[in-house]
Amino acid sequence: MAESIKQKPARLAGPGLPDFRNLGVMLRVLLVVNLLALLTVALRADDAGRLAADLALMAGRVELPLLLAVLLLYLLGPALRRLHARAGQAAVFAVASLAVMISSPLTGADAPALLRALAWSWLAAAITLLYFDYRNWRFTPALAEARLMALTARIRPHFF
């Protein structure tokens, strides 16, 4: 007896990239990176009076590369989805690096500042990708349970 296509369980999502064309994903990327910038400023602050000024400086350094990276990830979204998981993650790091390098002439950064910005962007990209992997891992059991409940609801009328 052949199985119905609808009854075959869908392959659960493994480690991979989120859909960078989704507005929710874009919002989460912006929030995670901005929270990391806020945390960086809070950890580095010596004086509470300079916290607002340091936060404004950090926002000036972070926002342009961040928006550029989100735009590039949006444009490259379909190509990134076709890549293997590790290659896609490497491409995200490359996009983050490219965004920093493109925006660095506008900020007038010297070589050490550029290296710090690249390192910070790699750290932010790694934490953001880890967040999406963790989120995917947490939702996987819920999806399997929802599929089982839907199947049970379809079968129940035949037996009661």
Describe each PLM feature range.
Residues 1-140:
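Hydrophobic alpha-helices of bacterial signal-transduction systems
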